[in-house]
Curated annotation (Swiss-Prot):
This is Cytochrome b6. One of its GO terms (molecular function) is oxidoreductase activity. GO terms for cellular component: chloroplast thylakoid membrane. It is found in: Plastid, Chloroplast thylakoid membrane. It comes from the Eukaryota. Component of the cytochrome b6-f complex, which mediates electron transfer between photosystem II (PSII) and photosystem I (PSI), cyclic electron flow around PSI, and state transitions. Binds 2 heme b groups non-covalently with two histidine residues as axial ligands. Binds one heme group covalently by a single cysteine link with no axial amino acid ligand. This heme was named heme ci. It comes from Adiantum capillus-veneris. Heme b 2 binds at H86, H187. It is a multi-pass membrane protein. The gene is petB. Belongs to the cytochrome b family. PetB subfamily.
Length: 215
């Protein structure tokens, strides 16, 4: 085992990386409220794991979506638990994210030189809400269907381009299979990828600039 470690150490300098991580200075004013960002990350990882598990059984079609969710809840081993954890974690992620935004704002964590950290955080907040909007429609029940119809109909009030935006979101003039396919793709691929990229940027900036000081 020692030889294996030495082989990696010689090439990657693992010990130097570990020392940098473990020796980072933590200001004395930091309290439990400064952990809200990390809790949001934990919820996101839970979402990825449970969501990935459900993709094995979920069918993104208007005729089979609802029945596949029912199958997950009633037939798949621990499917009810996986989906429930996914829902609970989603709600907790939104709640903790909101608290995190308030904490950063109230403690002035958005001020110079951390403006870009704040911007990436706001983008992450928008992505988090987008997860909720797209995920809400995937069971394709009455609530999900009408929620999608209302949400995708909002841009229609925009002059000149409103109708085009609605058709772009829905994939057609009305809500249907194209809409579900779009929302499924957004929820399972586009949004997770964007969130992972912006989270990496967010944490690298925090790592570089450190935690903001007290008020």
């Amino acid at each position: 085992m020692s030889k294996v470690y030495d082989w990696f150490e010689e090439r990657l300098e693992i010990q130097a990386i570990a020392d940098d991580i473990t020796s980072k200075y933590v200001p004395p004013h930091v309290n439990i409220f400064y952990c809200l960002g990390g809790i949001t990350l934990t919820c996101f990882l839970v979402q990825i794991a449970t969501g990935f598990a459900m993709t094995f059984y979920y069918r993104p079609t208007v005729t089979e979506a609802f029945s596949s969710v029912q199958y997950i809840m009633t037939e798949v081993n621990f499917g009810w638990l996986i989906r429930s954890v996914h829902r609970w974690s989603a709600s907790m992620m939104v709640l903790v994210m909101i608290l995190h935004v308030f904490r950063v704002y109230l403690t002035g964590g958005f001020k110079k030189p951390r403006e870009l950290t704040w911007v990436t955080g706001v983008i992450l907040a928008v992505l988090t809400v987008s997860f909720g909007v797209t995920g809400y429609s995937l069971p394709w029940d009455q609530i999900g269907y009408w929620a999608v119809k209302i949400v995708t109909g909002v841009p229609e009030a925009i002059p000149f381009i409103g109708s085009s935006l609605v058709e772009l979101l829905r994939g057609s003039v009305s809500v249907g299979q194209s809409t579900l396919t779009r929302f499924y793709s957004l929820h399972t691929f586009v949004l997770p990828l964007l969130t992972a990229v912006f989270m990496l940027m967010h944490f690298l900036m925090i790592r570089k600039q450190g935690i903001s000081g007290p008020l």
